[in-house]
Design a protein with these regions (language model features):
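Bacterial N-terminal signal peptides that target proteins for export
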Residues: 2-10
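C-terminal motif of bacterial Sec signal peptides marking the signal peptidase cleavage site
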Residues: 18-21
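Bacterial signal peptide processing site
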Residues: 23-26
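Short, solvent-exposed loop/linker segments at the N-terminal edge
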Residues: 38-44
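Surface-exposed binding patches on compact interaction domains or structured appendages
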Residues: 44-111
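Short, hydrophobic beta-strand segments
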Residues: 108-120
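A short beta-strand micro-motif common to beta-rich folds, especially ectodomain repeats
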Residues: 122-134
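Low-complexity, Pro/Ser/Thr- and charge-rich linker/hinge segments at domain boundaries
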Residues: 146-161
Length: 161
């Protein structure tokens, strides 16, 4: 009887020790169940991706083409920021070159807005936005359809003597 009681005590202590070892960092809310793919065009210039939790940040914006300048500011567009954003930080990421411009806005922890300016390339432009936290990272694939090119209606010259 004494050995059964001793085993029961050891079992209870072992379970208590295991439960005491768990902390809140182990239980992380999943912020995005799947890696979405987003398409923007001339008719659909804005797309919003919704998140399941607010424990994520914008980690970076990458493209397969070189020459895309990436800059970040606060929501008012005034103060410069660096990527990756700090935990819970909001802001706007601007991506631009001679043929393309778009922006990614994190206004709160539950949504990410993609806003297209123009894509003057002859084919769709693809970029990847990395979002995540210190435990998990996801990639959102974004495709921009080509927009209409500029057309010159007329050229006039003025000769000055």
């Amino acid at each position: 009887m004494k050995t059964t009681f001793r085993r029961l005590q050891c079992g209870i202590l072992a379970v208590a020790w295991l439960l005491a070892g768990c902390n809140s960092d182990v239980f992380i809310d999943r912020f995005l169940s799947a890696e979405p793919s987003v398409s923007l065009s001339e008719t659909e210039k804005e797309v919003t991706v919704c998140f399941e939790a607010d424990n994520w940040d914008i980690l970076g914006v990458e493209s397969l083409r070189e020459g895309v300048a990436v800059s970040a500011t606060d929501l008012e567009g005034k103060n410069s920021k660096y990527l990756p954003f700090e935990e819970g930080e909001t802001g706007i990421v601007y991506c631009k070159n001679a043929f393309l411009d778009f922006r990614v806005e994190k206004r709160n922890g539950s949504e990410l807005h993609f806003i297209s300016g123009e894509n003057l390339y002859d084919q769709p432009f693809e970029t990847f936005v990395r979002v995540g936290n210190r435990y998990e990272e996801k990639v959102i694939r974004v495709s921009f359809s080509p927009t209409r090119k500029y057309q010159i209606d007329s050229v006039s010259y003025c000769l000055l003597y």
